[in-house]
């Protein structure tokens, strides 16, 4: 991961590798984002159960994009397609969390129709042991 992406990432490289192994073992969903003309992987979207909601058909998204491809619409296109697919599978609500400082990601979620739910102050220790406030967003068809 590049430095621009790591600053908004709560995992170390080792934790990220372990998460990939867990996904393979537990069959959680992960989508790679590829460039159409070269098939180069430029990012990923991870889908997991929303563990903050109880007895609700809810999933949580997290996503990463190589900084060379920021602000080109790639993540918007990928998330839009995934959200449509999840709602077709009768998911009730989809959540996402972003660090307070990650204004571009917050704007992306809002553009996709997510609503701001609130802030967990000092919610996540991220890269280089920096503690971040964590913004919560969700989208629902209900």
Identify the residue ranges that each predicted region occupies:
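Conserved GNAT-fold acetyl-CoA-binding loop/helix
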Residues: 1-21
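A short helix-loop-beta-strand connector motif used in the catalytic cores of GNAT acetyltransferases and
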Residues: 20-32
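Acyl-donor (CoA/ACP) binding surface of acyl/acetyltransferases
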Residues: 30, 34-142
């Amino acid at each position: 991961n590049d430095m621009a992406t790591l600053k908004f990432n709560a995992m170390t490289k080792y934790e990220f590798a372990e998460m990939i192994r867990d996904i393979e073992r537990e069959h959680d969903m992960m989508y790679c984002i590829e460039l159409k003309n070269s098939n180069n992987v430029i990012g990923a979207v991870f889908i997991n159960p929303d563990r903050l909601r109880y007895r609700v058909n809810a999933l949580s998204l997290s996503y990463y994009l190589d900084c060379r491809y920021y602000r080109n619409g790639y993540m918007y296109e990928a998330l839009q397609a995934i959200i449509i697919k999840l709602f077709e599978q009768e998911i009730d609500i989809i959540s996402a969390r972003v660090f307070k400082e990650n204004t571009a990601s917050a704007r992306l979620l809002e553009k996709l129709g997510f609503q701001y739910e609130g802030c967990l102050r000092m919610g996540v220790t991220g890269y280089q042991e920096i503690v971040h406030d964590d913004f919560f967003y969700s989208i629902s068809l209900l």
